[in-house]
Amino acid sequence: MSWQTYVDTNLVGTGAVTQAAIIGHDGNTWATSAGFAVSPANGAALANAFKDATAIRSNGFELAGTRYVTIRADDRSVYGKKGSAGVITVKTSKAILIGVYNEKIQPGTAANVVEKLADYLIGQGF
């Protein structure tokens, strides 16, 4: 399965996230939903946050032109909020999954979808 298929089917296609991307640990985009562009600089900053979350805990982070307040940050997951919308990011051994949800979607529903896909990819060696 291609990275784009994971974005289109396993993330956005579930209805639990409205936009999604899969990026490498270097911040470069592997696949993305239409209209959602993560800059290499934002991607690299996010990747670094999994190693040291100090900066994003106090300053938040930006993805695709939206600034988020950090509500969770550890070596596996970084969650952000903007109003009642937010973003779930999960690191696997080779990639970072990003799922954005809007105010109509429950944060737990979005987190469940992104975290489960991450678990699957980790199980496949990714």
Curated annotation (Swiss-Prot):
The modification N6,N6,N6-trimethyllysine is found at K104. It is found in: Cytoplasm, Cytoskeleton. The record marks K116 as: Actin binding. GO terms for cellular component: cell cortex; cytoskeleton. One of its GO terms (molecular function) is actin monomer binding. Keywords: Actin-binding, Cytoplasm, Cytoskeleton, Methylation. Pfam families: Profilin. The keyword Lyase does not apply. InterPro entries: PFN, PFN_euk, PFN_sf, Profilin_CS. The modification Blocked amino end (Ser) is found at S2. Occurs in many kinds of cells as a complex with monomeric actin in a 1:1 ratio. Belongs to the profilin family. Binds to actin and affects the structure of the cytoskeleton. At high concentrations, profilin prevents the polymerization of actin, whereas it enhances it at low concentrations. By binding to PIP2, it inhibits the formation of IP3 and DG. This is Profilin-2. It comes from Acanthamoeba castellanii (Amoeba).
